[in-house]
Amino acid sequence: NSTRFIIITNQKIFRKDAKKVSICFEIAHESGSLYHMLSHFIYNNLNMTKIESRPIEGRNWEYRFFIDFDGNLADSAVKNALRGLRDEARNMKILGNY
């Protein structure tokens, strides 16, 4: 088990020394949809360190994925991967860069 403590703000704060990014998104319940999402990490040579899925309440067989990966929001590879993920995901959110 692990516990995370976070500070929530409505302001975007970018740190140059941040080394990890956390995101979440939803995808359709279709064959290969998760594979296509994860390919953005492979093509941009990003190291995914954690993935979790949680069922979406009231929507059978649909899940929200929480992913941590190494990088900084200022990195071009991270920007490129996030652009691709946004194009394919539903409700993608950047949870933090720390």
Explain the meaning of each model-derived region.
Residues 1-98:
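Domain-level signature for soluble enzymes in the chorismate/prephenate branch of the shikimate pathway
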